[in-house]
Amino acid sequence: MNNSNNSQSLYQSLWNAADILRGKMDANEYKSYLLGLIFYKYLSDKLLLAVCDNLDESFDSLSQAQRLYEENFADPDVKEDLLDVLDDELGYFIEPGLTFTALVAKVHTSNFQLEDLAQGFRDIEQSNEIFENLFEDIDLYSKKLGPTPQKQNQVISALIKELHELNLSNHDGDVLGDAYEYLIGQFASDSGKKAGEFYTPQAVSHLMTQIVFLGREHQKGMTLYDPTMGSGSLLLNAKRYSKESSTVSYFGQEINTSTYNLARMNMMLHGVAIENQKLHVGDTLDADWPTTEPTDFDGVLMNPPYSQKWSGDAGFLQDARFSSYGVLAPKSKADFAFLLHGFYHLKHSGVMAIVLPHGVLFRGNAEQKIRQHLLEEGAIDTVIGLPANIFYNTSIPTTVIILKKNRTSKDVLFIDASKEFDKGKNQNIMTDDHIAKILKAYQDRQDVDKFAHLASFEEIVENDYNLNIPRYVDTFEEEPVIPLTELADKLAQTDEEIAATTAQLEAMLGQLVGTTPEAQAELTASDCRQTSFWCLSFLLFLEKNGCFN
């Protein structure tokens, strides 16, 4: 079986484990249980591997590794050495009796207690600052798991048994990370509108990340920043497009603690070193972060909540992020507040990509003044119109805006990718081919009929700094011209068909009315049904031929 099939098998097995919780709570809730337990198993299996590696012991199964751990931990001298090694290499520690493998053994002998798992969670959370409160969203005693402690125990036991069948130690960090990302996407699909707070569709993530990394694939020590990071998927795509991904540093902030915990797990499952991730929980607009070095970044990637309300207090006019613009984003729409925050933290040589609703391109008043200021600075490099209905939390079309600080030109490239999608079951889907077409237009920076236009600054000024894409990219498709003789022939043919159908209908109506009381009495239900059919057929025929337009 090839790696692709292995990955798909792992994805499906992990998703099937959700069946145990599905129906007890919605996807937005049960994702914490499944993802949290997968992460606990990952940490546990990784610990057993580290123990055996440091003891220079080989093993054939996790159960054998568990026995080696228990035996050596019982020796006081070996125990102290192991604790030092685990703290140094992993940054966390799990008691031998609380590893995932040990919990499975307890489940099989009916000795498992929820407190065992709860204690394991606490041990990890207290072992290192980076794990603090990591499992706080997993309520092992929730009534949604079952009405009694016994029922709750049974559900968690079943989930532990299901996940134990998967040997996560057989997969490298990228496969596990991708599997985790797959699950997050599946949860987003199941969660619908609730998903917007934690997930950016992979196609959009790939497009934005590739743009940020264009020409910098081999740059070492790249710094990336996402102040509305959700699950961290935008940041983590750097592992695909950087040739020096092990040197990339990730900076992210998230206001929702549950989503923040999800991002932390996602980072670690993707193999991002602890020293390369600086994640923070907080309100991006109300309290700027980071405020200590580094405060500007090579790449800024953002998919903020759309048209969200914010305080917009006049005091923000003195905030370095907004002060040079003279106005603030409207209190009812924080879109430009998020954009200016990200742009403030962009290096002079950096690239920023942000997803926003189309309204930011043309709304007036304060937003127009901010837009004008950015355009006069040459900050707006490219505007890409995405298809409608590609996000889980909204069906509206969105736009990706690319910003830079070191441009010498004020022109703007417009790309209308609104038709670049395939129809999916619930959402429209952008494929690799669609993304490649957009990237080519972005790199070529030339006009493409009905797809892209490079607008001069003078053209934008003439449009009063309105960046609405249809003003610059004409996608109108003209109807083919039909010769008058051909049109006349079609009309004559249609008239003949209408006349024939009318005659048939009149004959049927004549049968329906009857000429004598006796004839009327002979009408049958079959006659009525047949006449109704002809009436309906006639109406459909008229509609098809445009008689109701």
What are the roles of these predicted feature ranges?
Residues 5, 286-287, 292-525:
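A conserved structural/catalytic subdomain of Rossmann-like adenosyl-cofactor enzymes
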Residues 1-212, 275-284, 385-388, 410-418, ...:
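Non-catalytic, mostly N-terminal accessory regions of nucleic-acid modification and defense proteins
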Residues 41-51, 187, 216, 242, ...:
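A generic secondary-structure signal for well-formed alpha-helical elements
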Residues 194-302, 307-316, 322-325, 336-337, ...:
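Conserved S-adenosyl-L-methionine
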Residues 263, 524-539, 545:
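N-terminal amphipathic/hydrophobic targeting modules at extreme N-termini
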